Amino acid sequence: MTARPDRAAARRNGGGTPVEQVGALRRLGVVPRRLVGFEAAGLVSLWLWVRRRRHGVPESATAVPYAGAVASTMVMFLVVSVVELVAVEILLRAVGAPAPLRHAILLIDAYGVLIALAVIAATVTRPHVIGPDGIRIRSAAFLDVRVPRRLVTEVRLVRNYNEQGTIRVDGDVLIVSAIAQTNLVVELTEPLRVVRPLGRVAYVRTIRFFADDPAAALAAATSSGAAVTSSGSG
């Protein structure tokens, strides 16, 4: 009779059963690995960007860009980062900061600029992909969801301008937005397992996402036979 209350009390105190504690530790370990993976994928994206190539777009598929909507915001962030780097260096020199400190701060700021460039490159080189096998929905290096053709019942146009967050799960709906917008919806026949950016798993039956040219994306879905489509708005 006391086992259940004791277990609840243990959870409140940060404990729990040994199995639960091991599971929690494993989840904590997933986050650093995924963060390192994001950085590695971003650096690969920089290399692809320089070579004007894209990641994961076979000849039989159609790339569906989404970088256009967020390009100005990301470039502005990059410019601010560069200005901050220069301003901090000038300030540290003016107050006579020792060279090792200046070099350390400069290195950290330069790495921040590199990461900002990597995110921009990942957004450009990792578009959504629509092909005969299905639909691949991505958000830079942070999310990569493959939707098999057999699960897709409908792709339709929508106009949502008030989405919250770039990547979010609301019930059984996955939302992948750009500057708070989505304009395409994919409906599924059954729940699809989705791994969120920091490793948490969700099961979704609807996906809302953004494309720079949603009409072209819908046409690609129709011509590739990737889905049963409808152009109705939602």
Predicted segments, located by residue:
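N-terminal membrane-targeting/pre-transmembrane regions
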Residues: 2-97, 202-206, 219
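Hydrophobic alpha-helical transmembrane segments of multipass integral membrane proteins
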Residues: 78-88, 106-117
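Hydrophobic alpha-helical transmembrane segments
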Residues: 95-110
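Conserved beta-hairpin
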Residues: 111-159
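Non-transmembrane, membrane-adjacent beta-strand/coil modules in membrane-associated proteins
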Residues: 139-208
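Cytosol-/stroma-facing membrane-proximal "stalk/adaptor" domains immediately downstream
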Residues: 200-234
